């Protein structure tokens, strides 16, 4: 697109961050709650930057802004009922202030941002493992525009057969096809708004057959060891 040009910036400086965090954990037989208060400030923060010339051509690159501060609260809670049910909920809300006065007097943002997520893992009759998870990004303001947020849910089931030698799994990402967001971008002499939507709903099916015997001395060799993959985990990890 000749009217939207992207280029690099070889003069970027590294970011330097100073942070402070206070954490607390409450643990009972079935429930664990972790809370964290945090504050951090970053100098020479790296951000995308857009300029539009008199001919209407947009130039997109990365720049250093003077400073950015983030302060807020993060909470993670996990509840278990034996080995059959696990619920994990997390969320964070924080205030962000960005100072870009090194580039323009009024460049920057000052507002709240937040996100949340959940994950439910369950063992049901017949040896089936079920997992449902979701995530939410709250609307927020950025240096040169706004982001309107989104929500998304995924689900998966799996089952072992023949004494664990065969495992079948089925996963659906973005079940309700909701992963899209609206945005605005504005600066000196330009304003743009739009909606971004990508193909996000997919169905994944897999069958794994394990055979042979893994010798003790071979465990952990190769790419991170046997079973080091992260996809489709039902042990509390993300898909």
Residue ranges and their predicted role:
Residues 1, 5, 37, 45-54, ...:
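Outer-membrane beta-barrel translocator domains and adjoining extracellular loop/strand segments
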Residues 17, 27-31, 70, 80-84, ...:
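Outer-membrane beta-barrel channels and translocator barrels
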Residues 29-31, 40-44, 82-84, 94-98, ...:
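Structural signature of outer-membrane beta-barrel domains
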Residues 1-10, 58-64, 74, 99-107, ...:
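Extracellular loop and loop/strand-boundary signature of outer-membrane beta-barrel proteins
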Residues 7-13, 19, 28-90, 104, ...:
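Outer membrane beta-barrel strand-and-loop segments of large Gram-negative receptors
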Residues 18, 24, 35-39, 89-95, ...:
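Transmembrane beta-barrel strands of outer-membrane/channel proteins
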Residues 109-239:
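Conserved C-terminal beta-signal and adjacent last beta-strands/turns
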Residues 25, 78, 157:
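Conserved SET/PR domain catalytic loop and adjacent active-site segment
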